[in-house]
Amino acid sequence: MKVLVVGNGGREHALAWKLLQSPQIEQVACVPGNGGTATLARCQNVSLAVDDFEGISQYALNQGFSLVVVGPEVPLAKGITDYLQEKGLMVFGPSRAGAQIEASKAWAKALMQEAGIPTAKAAVFTEAAAAKSYIQAQGAPIVVKADGLAAGKGVTVATTIEQAQSAIDAIFQGQFGSAGEFVVIEECLTGQEVSVLALTDGLTIRPLLPAQDHKRIGEGDTGENTGGMGAYAPAPIATPELMALVQTEVLERAIATLQSKGIDYRGVLYAGLMITPNGDFKVLEFNCRFGDPETQVILPLLATPLEELILACVQQRLGELPPIAWQGGASATVVAASGGYPGDYEKGQVITGIPQAEATGATVFHAGTKLNAQQQIVTDGGRVLNVTGIGENFQQALAQAYTGIKAIDFSGIYYRRDIGYRVNS
């Protein structure tokens, strides 16, 4: 079988890497891929944009790729699944209607309220004045969110009313483009965030291992939000008892409510949870795709062949499969970023030490990398590499990841030294 993976990040490298472990997979193509997928055996990069739906469909059909796995949220929100399915391709990823669960925070909040899913109290506004008067009445701390897709940068946890009002101005003045047509204002929840990614065929939904991400750029969870600076799985705070509640109160309710709206949702449903100090949980957000960097710690522990699960979702027979199997132990990944990220950064810096990192036993997933004219691997984004370790416990997994990342160098390299601080004691 030949599989086409859409995207160019660490998540997509991990998906291609995992798919290629199966003898059932003859070839993987990545659109557009990165420097890591370019060097995988039986994998090739295809120089097309992720929103060039016609080009992707023509390539897949002409080259005999029957299954398309979509990584990022933007093409899903633009309707890539609908387009490719009309051309006769099997697609793993929700339709444009289903992708609203990530593409519109206001739509997702309404769905949660309708479904009875535990979530933060919230209000939605279309003009700045009303939003600001609501904030005056509610007080700070408070959370301000741009409604649409903003690459993880559209959320402000405001500690003062002034900061919240500035965030509202930025959204309505167009900082996030069409993502800022609405603003969602939520109560500020405290506790630990957990990512629960689940696979669904539209009827059955099965969670993967819970993971914890580190979103802030700085050690001690300080500084600006990023796409994620590291992660580990399975997250101990997501106990079996809590996961059983998440299954019934979040995942199954979400799928049932999507069904009631006529939405046949097949792909990943990713619930971002806040676990409060008293052990309760609320859903902060839903995403319509694999998490990044969570995928890079979940897939190394997956024992069931990935393509079996993906095909079962696409063909709506997930309920017929045995429970998802996992190898024991723990997994951790540390993100190497370009200096200056999440602000401005340079591209084109030559990367050294990747073979040495892999020789330590770590797995290096490429994110913002490419091959230059001299066939050297160079930086090509803010988050550059994800160095993943696995072990019998978190101490071993984190030690392997950090031993690996210390072998890697490029001008301006930055990574957090405290990934896994909650579990590495």
Swiss-Prot record:
Top enzyme class: ligase
Pathway: Purine metabolism; IMP biosynthesis via de novo pathway; N(1)-(5-phospho-D-ribosyl)glycinamide from 5-phospho-alpha-D-ribose 1-diphosphate: step 2/2
A family per Pfam: GARS_N
EC numbers, comma separated: 6.3.4.13
List of residues binding Mg(2+): E285, N287
Keyword Metal-binding in annotation: yes
One GO term of the biological process aspect: 'de novo' IMP biosynthetic process
PROSITE patterns: ATP_GRASP (PS50975), GARS (PS00184)
Domain spans labelled ATP-grasp: 109-315
Residues the record lists as binding ATP: 135-195
Reactions this protein catalyses: 5-phospho-beta-D-ribosylamine + glycine + ATP = N(1)-(5-phospho-beta-D-ribosyl)glycinamide + ADP + phosphate + H(+)
Cofactor(s) this protein requires: Mg(2+); Mn(2+)
Cofactor comment: Binds 1 Mg(2+) or Mn(2+) ion per subunit.
InterPro entries, A to Z: ATP-grasp, ATP_grasp_subdomain_1, PreATP-grasp_dom_sf, PRibGlycinamid_synth_ATP-grasp, PRibGlycinamide_synth, PRibGlycinamide_synth_C-dom, PRibGlycinamide_synth_C_sf, PRibGlycinamide_synth_CS
Name of the protein described by the UniProt record: Phosphoribosylamine--glycine ligase
Organism whose genome encodes this protein: Nostoc sp. (strain PCC 7120 / SAG 25.82 / UTEX 2576)
